[in-house]
Amino acid sequence: MKRTLSILLTIAMIISLIPAVFAADVPTMSTTVDKTEVQPGDTITLTLSIDKTITNLNNWEWAIYFDKTAYVKTSGELEPGCMSGTGTTGAVGDNVDILGKNAIRVSGLSTTGDPVTLNAGKIATVTFTATENITAENARIEVKTEALPDYDTLKDNDVK
């Protein structure tokens, strides 16, 4: 009985390691903010980064969701050198409605059809100013992967 249990536990342990082995090549997206508490009128800066270079993309996009009664986007820019390839272009956009939610798109693409490389490190910086309507209930900012072919399992991030 002990031997059977030992074999089953060993098999279970090996099976549980399989996703980690295959996920080792998947890049990790991270978001950081420069403040942990925000009051009306405060400015916060959100930085979006990835830990591994991603090659052979036609396009990529993250969406930063936030309550527009709580924050106003005051600036946003892609990090110089975050993309490489022939005919690449990208931007940190203005407010858009995505399926009924307010968001800002951070995106890039190839205008020539040549592959785009998204380089490891800082991708974009976005600055927000908290409005007088900010509360604990509406202060959440959420970053989601909207378009990143072959990496649809990339973990999304919440900034609270």
Sequence positions of predicted segments:
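Positively charged n-region of N-terminal signal peptides that target proteins for export
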Residues: M1-L9
